[in-house]
Amino acid sequence: SFVPGYPDWVWRRPPMSDGDWYDRFSAQAVDVDGTDLEPLFEAARTAGVWVALGITERVRSGSLYNSVVYVNDRGELAGRHRKLVPTGAERLVWANGYDDVLTTVDIGNVRVGALICWENYMPLARVAMYERGVDVLLAPTWDNSDEWVPTLRHIAKEGQLFVVGVTAYLRGCDVPRDLPDADELYGGEDDLMSRGNSSIVAPGGELIAGPLIGSAGVVTATLDLSRIPSGRRMFDPVGHYSRPDVLTLDRSEHD
C-alpha cells in the first residue's frame, strides 16, 4: 500500500488502543469509485503511460482493502486487484479480497498481473496467474527480509516470466508525530520500518536490477520479452510441463 502507506503500527501497538491510528489511515485511504484517483488519471493521460499503484482502498461500508489499481495511458481505471488474505496483524486493518481478485491487464501484447506481498507464497494463486498467461508479475510487498529476493527469483523461474518486486524504504521519522505514542513507538532516521528490497527478475531467475536496500530510489530495467517463450520451451508450468489429468486448479470466478 503506497497510498496512504503501510499500517506498520499493527505490529507495535495493542489492537484495542490503535483507534486514532486506524482513523487517520482510513481517512486517507482511496475511494476508487469516487474522485480520489483523478490526479493519477490526469498524470497518466498527460505522460501517456500505464501506472500500477498499490493503495489502501476504502469502500462505502467502511471496509479497507490492500489493493493494486491499474490506470491506462488514456487516464482510465483499467483494473483492480484486492489482496486475497491479509497477513497476520494486517487483518486488524484490511479485509479479505472478495472480488476484483487475480485481475490481469493487457498492455499492448504484454499481460501484467499482481500478487501482493505474501500472496506470492500461495501456490494456487501463482498457478492461477500462470494460467492467465501473465508475462510480467508485479509483487509489491512489505517483506524486506533476506528471503524475499530468492522468493522472487523462484517465481520468475517457476513461471518463466518477469517479476517486478517493489518494497518501500521507510524510517521512523516518516511517521506523523501527532499520533498517540508516536515518539515512543518510532525513532528517527535510524529506525528502519522497511529497508527497501526492490528488485526486477528475468525469466529463469536472473536478477537484472536491484535489490535497492538502504535508501530511497527508483529501480528500472529493459525487459527482453523474447526470453519468455525461450524459457517456456524448457518449462511451461501450465502447458507442456503440466499434467492436468493428475493435477488441476479449480477456481471460483467473480464478475
Where are these regions (language model features)?
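Short beta->alpha transition motifs characteristic of CBS
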Residues: 3-9, 69, 81-87, 199, ...
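A short acidic, glycine-rich active-site loop
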Residues: 16-35, 186-193
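Short, compositionally biased leader-like segments
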Residues: 23-46, 148-178, 250-254
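Active-site catalytic loop in hydrolytic enzyme cores
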Residues: 29-32, 37-42, 57-136, 141-154, ...
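Active-site beta-strand/loop signature of hydrolases that rely on acidic residues for catalysis
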Residues: 1-14, 21-24, 44, 51-52, ...
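Short Pro/Gly-enriched beta-strand edge/turn motifs at strand-loop
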Residues: 50-55, 83-89, 179-185
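C-terminal beta-strand edge segments of enzyme domains
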Residues: 104, 168-255
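Short, hinge-like loop/turn segments at secondary-structure boundaries
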Residues: 12-13, 68-73, 155-157, 180-184
